[in-house]
Amino acid sequence: MTVRDGTEQRRRVVVVEDDEDIAELLTDILDAEGFAPVAVSDAAGLDRELGQRPDLIVLDLRLTRGGADKIMSSLRSRGLGDVPILLLSAASDLPDRAKELGVTSFLAKPFELEDFIVLVRRLL
């Protein structure tokens, strides 16, 4: 883990995940690594958070409400298509879906937290 001295701007990461335990785990690790994470559970929650432009969006592919397709469409229509998107899923078709959706990168669940942080840093 990296220790920050608090003098730099924390990069804003929005985690879109409807499993509360996973959302909490991801936001805790992001916060510990010096990012400014916020978790939302669906497309409506993400819409509320887009007033402040995120530096990265971590998106669960299989949301129960307002799926990834809807979210990607909404981001593009709002002029946020250039915000990096990290897609997470345990789905066997993850590489194909990631390509279809046009996300920046993807990570298959389950994953090691260190791999997650390395990928987040690379995307930022």
Where are these regions (language model features)?
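Acidic, metal-coordinating helix/loop segments flanking the phosphotransfer/catalytic sites
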Residues: 39-56
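Conserved phosphotransfer microenvironments
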Residues: 60-74
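Conserved acidic carboxylate
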Residues: 17, 89
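Non-catalytic signal-transmission and effector/linker regions of two-component phosphorelay proteins
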Residues: 1-14, 20, 27, 114-124
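Alpha4 helix (beta4-alpha4-beta5 surface) of REC/receiver domains from two-component response regulators
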Residues: 70, 91-107, 118
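Two-component/phosphorelay signaling modules centered on CheY-like receiver
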Residues: 20-38
